[in-house]
Amino acid sequence: MAIIPIFIPHAGCPHQCVFCNQKTISGQKTAAVDGAKEQINKWLEWVKPSLENEAAFYGGSFTGLDLALQKELLALTDELLGRKVIGSVRLSTRPDYIDEERLELLRAHGVKLVELGVQSLDDSVLQRAERGHTARQVTEAVALLKSYGFKVGVQLMVGMPGQDFASVKATVEQVLALQPDVARIYPLLVIKGTPLAKSYEAGEFEPLALEEAVCQAAYVYQHLSEVGIKIIRVGLQPDDELCAEGNIIAGPFHPAMGELVQSYLLREQLTPQILEAAKQSGDSILILCPNKLESKVRGLRNGNIKYWSVLVAPRKLILKGISISKIKIICVSSNDLEEAATQD
């Protein structure tokens, strides 16, 4: 499966949310149809036709665009659908730009998934961020999308002005009730040229530290994943413009935020098992894990290993990636390490 991304930066959105500099985030500066054609042609050079492929309009509020422009852009993806280069289209928009007329148009042009920029379901947080919509409008938009047969995505943030962890948890509970199909999780960053940057520079706003952002994002990730909501991204895509020198003024940015979150969740999951193993006889705690999970279990800069080593001291803690399907934790003697590490 391949996704053909088509960026329409800030197009269709009349609001300037305090954290948003959409031209920087989307990596493009115009929403012209010619620009969309150019992007599509670039991807067609290597994308093999498949009904599993998808075209995705990113970066703006698609249903807020002028109707004529919406139709012109959808005509481009209609051609791809007709040639069976793709099998469906997805796009993102604002919750308050969803109505029956708009959804009729999208459904007629092969759109299958609509992502909503929800960010929070706490009205006080939405107001402080100058989102321009309410939590109720999100609920109504999701219900209408589902009634038309669309899959629904939600984009959520942690670390917004006025948003504490309790607010994040309350939003998660409301999202679970909405039952979206997919979600993205973004820790808020202070981007150059935004109203939030002015607040930060004036000492009126303090972003989350990386560790706290990981903790809160992990909470969202875990609770949504547990009920089958697919997490399709954690953290902003670290493209050249976003990462340009001086563009990110402050905030919990990391190019592998998703891996940090998964490592944190593994730490929380495995800690009780490690402590239980430490009650057994032996001078070493051996963690055997599938090769593909080793970096996540280890944690950034061996963070998880260091954390567990303190808990089990003076025992030695050893992590080994091998060809197994599940993580195994055992307490063994140093003399038996080699044999234990080869167990199935």
Predicted features and spans:
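Short acidic/His/Gly/Ser-rich catalytic and metal-binding motifs that mark active-site loops
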Residues: 13-17, 191-198, 242-244
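Conserved non-cysteine loop/helix-boundary elements of the Radical SAM core domain that shape
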Residues: 25-38, 59-214
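Conserved beta-strand core positions
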Residues: 4, 55, 89, 114, ...
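N-terminal pre-triad scaffold of radical SAM enzymes
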Residues: 1-26, 44-63, 92-94, 111-113, ...
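A short, N-terminal amphipathic alpha-helix
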Residues: 39-48, 218, 222
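Auxiliary Fe-S-binding modules of radical SAM enzymes
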Residues: 2-3, 203-344
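Short glycine-enriched loops at secondary-structure junctions
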Residues: 9-12, 186-191, 237-238
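Short loop/turn motifs at secondary-structure junctions
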Residues: 16, 51-53, 85, 110-112, ...
